[in-house]
C-alpha cells in the first residue's frame, strides 16, 4: 500500500469519525429538552390546523422570555392516541365542528385525570361544538369564569383584568373559562379572545405589536402554570 493511499484512507476515516461525532451530538442535543407540547387533531370537520405558526412562536417566546426549555417542534396528536400522555400541554383550536367518539372521550378524560392539561382557544365559531364535546368528558362539570386573581393570570406576567382582547367579534368581553376537577384546573378555555391569532406571525392578521406581545405573555403564563402545576 502506498503512502498516498494510506493518507487517503486516514482522511476518509477522520471524516467518518467527524460525521459520527456530529450525529451523536445532534441526536443528544435534539433530545435535551424538558418538554414537548402537542396540537390536538380532532374529527368533525373543524379546522384543527388553524393558526399554523402560533405554537412555534409561543414556544420561541417562552424559551426566550421565561426560561423554559420546550422542544421548538410541536407534534400533531390525535385525540384517541395514547401518545397524548407524553405531552403535559395539549392545544385545541379551530372555527367549526368538533366531534369526539367514545374512545376519544375515554382517552382524553384519562389524560386529564392523569395530570395532563388541555388549552382550548376559541378561534371564533368553536364554542357551541366544544362545549357539547367537553360535556361528554366531564358531564358533571361546567365551564366557570376564572377569577382575576387565579394563578394562571399571575405567573411571570400579571393580567389583573383577566384575558387580553386580541380580536373583536361579537362585542363580547374575553373570558378565561376553566374546568376544575378535584381542585385542579384541567382545562383552560380562552373564549372571545383569539389568543392563538395573537401568537401567529405578525403579517398573518396584522395585529399590533402590543396585542401580539400581550397574547404571547398570556400564553407564556398558561404554559408556566401547566408546568409548575400550581393549585387553584
Predicted feature residues:
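An acidic, glycine-rich "communication" segment
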Residues: 35-36, 41-45, 53-54, 127-203, ...
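Surface-exposed patches in mature extracellular/periplasmic domains of secreted proteins
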Residues: 69-77, 120-123, 141-147, 232
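Short alpha-beta junction capping motif
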Residues: 37, 89-128
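Loop/turn elements at helix/coil->beta-strand transitions in domains of secreted/extracellular proteins
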Residues: 33-35, 85-90, 113-117, 141, ...
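Positively charged n-region of N-terminal signal peptides that target proteins for export
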Residues: 9-16
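Bacterial N-terminal signal peptides
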Residues: 16-26
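Aromatic-Pro/Gly-enriched surface loop or interdomain linker
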Residues: 30-89, 93-96, 194-195, 199-232
